[in-house]
């Protein structure tokens, strides 16, 4: 019996709640009997490994992130058993497209050539994209930074808009607005995800 594989990106600007949402979504679908795999956020891994934007420069830094993202996505797909008795959902904490928003057009082309990829082909890696709105947009009083995220609100807003512009051309793109109660935001995300998966 062939079981369904659904590949979903959860993206969004700084302080959108992506990582927390992914943990909640993972648990929700595991409880429904799905096999749920997660491709963790790559920039955080790169930064914690010691490769920083300040020391390595923008292009080597972004190229390292994109290259690792590509490898992680391949590994997860290759690890899937050929015979599995349940449907599979792969959750991506941001996708390849996200990592191109930090460089200009010439730099994008150079990275594509160096890694032998095409951005427009990368959209096909994912079945659906759920964009969680950054609290910087609409709820700036709830915005905060972390060890690996240090953008001011203004920069976070700029990134939010770039992410939206980059992803909204995907064949299934859904924008999840911020809510005062984060539970409402999570519930809205899961509701829309259910509609997509069960369609």
Where are these regions (language model features)?
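Phosphate-binding P-loop
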Residues: 1-7
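A glycine- and Lys/Arg-enriched "phosphate-lid" helix/loop adjacent to the NTP-binding pocket
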Residues: 102, 106-168, 177-184
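Conserved nucleotide-sensing/catalytic segment adjacent to the nucleotide-binding pocket
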Residues: 51-91, 95-96, 100-109
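Hydrophobic positions on the alpha1 helix immediately C-terminal to the Walker A/P-loop
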Residues: 21
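Conserved lysine of the Walker
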Residues: 18
């Amino acid at each position: 019996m062939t079981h369904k594989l659904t590949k979903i990106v959860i993206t969004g600007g700084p302080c959108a709640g992506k990582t927390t949402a992914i943990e909640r979504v993972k648990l929700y679908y595991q409880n429904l009997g799905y096999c749920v795999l997660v491709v963790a956020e790559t920039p955080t891994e790169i930064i914690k490994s010691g490769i920083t934007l300040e020391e390595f420069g923008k292009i080597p830094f972004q190229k390292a992130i994109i290259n690792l993202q590509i490898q992680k996505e391949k590994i997860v797909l290759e690890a899937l058993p050929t015979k599995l008795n349940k449907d599979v959902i792969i959750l991506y904490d941001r996708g390849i497209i996200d990592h191109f928003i930090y460089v200009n057009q010439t730099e994008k082309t150079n990275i594509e050539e160096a890694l032998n990829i095409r951005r427009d082909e990368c959209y096909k890696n994912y079945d659906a994209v759920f964009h969680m709105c950054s609290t910087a947009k609409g709820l700036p009083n709830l915005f905060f930074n972390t060890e690996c995220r240090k953008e001011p609100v203004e920069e976070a807003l700029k990134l939010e808009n770039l992410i939206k512009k980059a992803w909204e051309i995907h064949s299934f793109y859904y924008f999840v607005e911020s809510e005062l109660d984060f539970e409402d935001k999570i519930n809205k995300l899961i509701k829309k995800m259910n509609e997509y998966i069960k369609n």
